[in-house]
């Protein structure tokens, strides 16, 4: 906690349209040590940012450097694909006067130049890409449960081998429910982690068994691909 402002500022300076900062809880290996598991993980800051594909590498690198993500205890950073959406809405309302946009032009130049080295700033001779070892092809496993039960799901994820876990809270609108104030104000938790593709099914089954044993009848799982992630790897 305490570095979200620096990361968000770096995203803005890299051209990202409005990063969002949210708050929740998170934990990792230290939570598996019994003497340290007095309370749930400390409060965490989450910085979310949606950018065009052509800008993703540069923005990712600038955010990672600002947050010093590859240093011990500095958090976990990852990207997920967004297939449809609108960003910079004010600039996309009217039709473009050109036959192609920058998202099409930049990848085309990458192909022509045989890579991304041409993007190097000639004045500083530095590329926007970050020099580090990425974790690749992970899967994000997300579980939605009523907030009262999030601690059990949080523990189950860590107890079954996940390297870390994060939690966000919010109110979910259910179109099939009545309009009672109690249901409208009911808080839910989104508890999630990232693991290798071979571990997704076993982890989901283990957490499902825990949820069933608790008698929870309202919950949901979903997964998202994580093409790359960055954190401290030790050594």
What are these regions (language model features)?
Residues 1-235:
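Positively charged, small/polar-rich N-terminal and surface patches that mediate targeting and assembly
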């Amino acid at each position: 906690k305490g570095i979200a402002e620096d990361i968000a500022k770096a995203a803005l300076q890299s051209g990202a349209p409005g990063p969002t900062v949210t708050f929740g809880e998170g934990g990792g290996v230290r939570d598996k040590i019994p003497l340290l598991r007095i309370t749930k993980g400390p409060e965490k800051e989450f910085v979310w940012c949606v950018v065009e594909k052509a800008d993703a590498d540069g923005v990712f690198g600038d955010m990672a450097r600002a947050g010093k993500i590859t240093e011990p205890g500095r958090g976990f950073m990852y990207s997920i694909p967004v297939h449809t959406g609108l960003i910079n809405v004010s600039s996309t309302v009217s039709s473009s006067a050109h036959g192609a946009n920058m998202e099409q032009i930049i990848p085309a130049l990458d192909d022509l130049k045989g890579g991304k080295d041409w993007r190097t700033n000639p004045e500083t001779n530095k590329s926007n890409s970050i020099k580090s070892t990425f974790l690749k092809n992970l899967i994000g496993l997300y579980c939605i449960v009523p907030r009262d039960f999030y601690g059990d799901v949080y523990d189950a994820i860590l107890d079954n081998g996940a390297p870390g876990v994060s939690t966000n809270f919010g109110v979910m609108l259910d179109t099939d429910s009545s309009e009672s104030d109690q249901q409208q104000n009911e808080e839910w938790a989104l508890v999630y982690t990232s693991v290798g593709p071979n571990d997704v099914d076993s982890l989901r089954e283990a957490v499902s068994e825990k949820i069933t044993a608790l008698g929870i009848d309202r919950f949901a799982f979903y997964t998202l691909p994580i093409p790359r992630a960055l954190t401290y790897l030790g050594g």
